[in-house]
Regions:
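One-carbon transfer enzymes
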Residues: 1-208
């Protein structure tokens, strides 16, 4: 189980995996092929992990590596996707997808659209999407493990957000994470939009 040392609400996901009789190794730092072989890892579940998983690791696991992501991919890839879903007024939601070499570009396994009201805050919206991710995993974990869900390739559109963009906008919020959804949406009203240009993604190469 790959995550970061500041991530909250990870116990529910760990408990879910252990409920199916699997041993869970919790890891925060980077991994390589030697680590995977030494620990005899056969599946990776990534949740808010901050390191790149290299191609040789993905190939060694035969694609058995998935990630949770708090947006309706292909929109809001990258940093703080929930925040940018609100700011840029795109659909909100959560996705579970295969891990590939790209940034949140892997095939989509399952998704769920979410809805916030204007008086929700960034903090309460975080609580909502975390519960949704856990629920989505609970409903589909057995089917994911047994490959009973056919992953769907992502459309080659969408956008990527970066920490430097988030820092610019978040600095304008006097209430920080207690800022309401309505206030976040209003940041761009009557102000020039600092555009987050869609990144063009090349066609996926076959690794046969």
């Amino acid at each position: 189980f790959l995550t970061n040392d500041k991530a909250d609400h990870v116990d529910e996901i760990i408990d879910l995996v252990q409920m199916y009789g699997d041993k869970v190794i919790i890891h925060h730092s980077g991994i390589d092929i030697d680590f995977v072989k030494q620990k005899k890892i056969d599946y990776i579940l990534s949740d808010r992990y901050s390191h790149i998983i290299k191609r040789d690791v993905i190939d060694y696991l035969n694609g058995n590596a998935i990630n949770t992501h708090p947006s309706l991919l292909p929109f809001q890839r990258g940093y703080q996707p929930n925040f940018f879903s609100i700011l840029l007024n795109t659909k909100k939601g959560v996705s579970i997808h295969k891990i590939d070499e790209g940034l949140d570009t892997g095939d989509i396994i399952v998704q769920e659209e979410l809805f916030y009201n204007d008086q929700d805050t960034l903090k309460t919206s975080h609580y909502i999407f975390r519960k949704a991710i856990v629920s989505l995993l609970c409903k589909n974990w057995y089917k994911i493990l047994n490959e009973n869900i056919l992953p769907i390739p992502q459309e080659r559109k969408g956008n990527i957000n970066y920490k430097k963009d988030f820092d610019i906008f978040f600095a304008q919020l006097s209430n920080g994470w207690c800022t309401t959804v309505e206030e976040v949406k209003n940041i761009l009203k009557n102000k020039p939009l600092i555009r987050v240009e869609p990144k063009k993604f090349p066609a996926k190469k076959s690794h046969s």
